[in-house]
Regions:
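Acidic, PIN/NYN-like endoribonuclease modules and their adjacent C-terminal/linker elements
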Residues: 1-6, 104, 108-136
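Short, well-structured N-terminal submotif of metal-dependent ribonuclease cores
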Residues: 1-41, 51-64
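Histidine- and aromatic-rich ligand-binding microenvironments
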Residues: 10, 42, 95-97, 118, ...
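Conserved glycosyltransferase catalytic-site signature
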Residues: 11, 43, 76, 100-101
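A generic structural signal for short hydrophobic patches within well-formed alpha-helices
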Residues: 14, 46-49, 121-122
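Acidic catalytic patch
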Residues: 47-48, 70-91
Length: 136
């Protein structure tokens, strides 16, 4: 994928983009990334999305929709990096949910930025190599 940087889209963005009250900027950004084939996901984000499905039909629709974008694997060393990052942050008095740390480590490992609506990622970006996409 030379020249095409992927953007890992966090669950917080997917939920907002799919909402009936969706922020038009959020929805537009997601649609642009999808259109340019730059949207990416990973296992933990898929699990979070599917856990939040409202009906069996919604679950199946989400599974099909999310299956059509780039999938970032989570090798064993990424789990270890997440554990180390969590340990290091806690030693500094910073507590971040492990799911968010894992998502950040997956983005870092794949050299892609993260599109989010979650304050934990803003904190992680200020303390780690995580690159985040901002809404204007």
């Amino acid at each position: 994928m030379p020249g095409k940087e992927l953007v890992l889209i966090d669950t917080s963005v997917w939920i907002q983009a799919d909402s009936l009250k969706a922020n038009s900027e959020v929805k537009s950004k997601v649609l642009l990334l999808l259109d340019k084939d730059r949207a990416a996901t990973c296992g933990i984000i898929i699990a979070e999305l599917l856990c939040g499905a409202k009906t069996p039909t919604n679950y199946e629709e989400l599974k099909i929709d999310i299956g059509g974008i780039h999938y970032l694997n989570t090798p064993e060393d990424v789990w270890l990096k997440a554990a180390q990052m969590s340990f290091d942050l806690r030693k500094k008095g910073i507590s971040v949910p492990l799911t968010d740390i894992l998502i950040a480590c997956i983005a870092i490992d794949n050299n892609c930025s993260l599109l989010h609506l979650d304050k934990h990622f803003t904190c992680l970006a200020s303390k780690t190599d995580l690159k985040i996409e901002l809404f204007e």
